[in-house]
Amino acid sequence: MLANYAFIGVFFIGAIIFPIIPLAAAYFLGPKRPTPIKLDTYECGLEAIGDIRVQFKIQYYLYALAFVIFDIEVVFLYPWAVAYGQLGLFAFIAMAIFLIILIGGLVYEWKKGALEWV
């Protein structure tokens, strides 16, 4: 039984070690002589003029958050729709409750005006 999960353990360890090796190599083998010119912001061959950071409106974040929420909904909805014939009534009720909660959240956002672009 434990041998069945050995592959998952090896994969998990590899997934942790694989990104650490290049990061450690870059840290230990890379040059460590920062100068003001090296630390300066550089983009497209032009020197940056003014403040580099641009503050975005909160509406961008609200739309992005709503997109992520409904994208995750699709991730849950697709496998359920594919296996709908074998799942039965309990899975239908569970997904209906899930969709009602998400639609309730969308209606709440709409009523609060979070989806209005001003």
From Swiss-Prot:
An example molecular function term from Gene Ontology annotations: NADH:ubiquinone reductase (non-electrogenic) activity
Enzyme class: translocase
Membrane topology type: Multi-pass membrane protein
InterPro entries reported in the protein's UniProt record: NAD(P)H_OxRDtase_bac/plastid (IPR023043), NADH_UbQ/plastoQ_OxRdtase_su3 (IPR000440), NDAH_ubi_oxred_su3_sf (IPR038430)
Localization terms from the record: Cell membrane
Pfam families documented for this protein: Oxidored_q4
Keyword line: Cell membrane, Membrane, NAD, Quinone, Translocase, Transmembrane, Transmembrane helix, Transport, Ubiquinone
TM region(s), chain numbering: 6-26, 62-82, 87-107
EC number(s) from the headed UniProt entry: 7.1.1.-
Superkingdom of origin: Bacteria
GO cellular component: NADH dehydrogenase complex; plasma membrane
Record text on subunit structure and interactions: NDH-1 is composed of 14 different subunits. Subunits NuoA, H, J, K, L, M, N constitute the membrane sector of the complex.
Family per record: Belongs to the complex I subunit 3 family.
Full protein name: NADH-quinone oxidoreductase subunit A
Gene for this chain: nuoA
